[in-house]
Amino acid sequence: MAKEELLEMEGLVDEILPDSRYRITLDNGHKLIAYTAGRVKKNHIRILAGDKVSLEVSPYDLSKGRITFRHIDKKQSFAGAPYRRH
């Protein structure tokens, strides 16, 4: 059985929920719950409320999705922020 194609969508993070889940409002107004993809977790990419994200949604369940990319907002500048070393 072939793997089904996932729907690529963009949305805005409304709320951060427990267990690495997020409440997302898509550009078309639909709301869903999404979790972070493995690559996003692995690279420790922080997602905050108000961030614009790309996500994949299964055609079988349109109420759940997986965040695959966080879009960078050009308005924020981190040039003045001190460098923090772990």
UniProtKB/Swiss-Prot annotation:
Could you tell me the superkingdom of the organism this chain comes from? Bacteria
Q: Which family does it belong to?
A: Belongs to the IF-1 family.
Under the heading InterPro entries, the entry gives:
NA-bd_OB-fold, RNA-binding_domain_S1_IF1, TIF_IF1
Protein biosynthesis recorded as keyword: yes
Q: How does it assemble?
A: Component of the 30S ribosomal translation pre-initiation complex which assembles on the 30S ribosome in the order IF-2 and IF-3, IF-1 and N-formylmethionyl-tRNA(fMet); mRNA recruitment can occur at any time during PIC assembly.
GO molecular function terms attached to this record: ribosome binding; rRNA binding; translation initiation factor activity
Indicate the principal place this protein occupies in or around the cell: cytoplasm
Task of the protein: One of the essential components for the initiation of protein synthesis. Stabilizes the binding of IF-2 and IF-3 on the 30S subunit to which N-formylmethionyl-tRNA(fMet) subsequently binds. Helps modulate mRNA selection, yielding the 30S pre-initiation complex (PIC). Upon addition of the 50S ribosomal subunit IF-1, IF-2 and IF-3 are released leaving the mature 70S translation initiation complex.
Q: Where in the cell is it found?
A: Cytoplasm
Pfam families, A to Z: eIF-1a (PF01176)
Extract the signal peptide range: none
* Taxonomic source organism: Polynucleobacter asymbioticus (strain DSM 18221 / CIP 109841 / QLW-P1DMWA-1)
This protein's GO cellular component annotations are: cytosol
Which keywords fit this entry according to its UniProt record? Answer: Cytoplasm, Initiation factor, Protein biosynthesis, RNA-binding, rRNA-binding
The record's listing under PANTHER family reads: TRANSLATION INITIATION FACTOR IF-1, CHLOROPLASTIC
Query: Which residues are connected by disulfide bridges in this protein?
Result: none
User: Where exactly are the transmembrane stretches of this chain?
Assistant: none
Which protein, by its recorded name, is this? Translation initiation factor IF-1 2
- Domain (S1-like): residue spans on this chain: 1-72
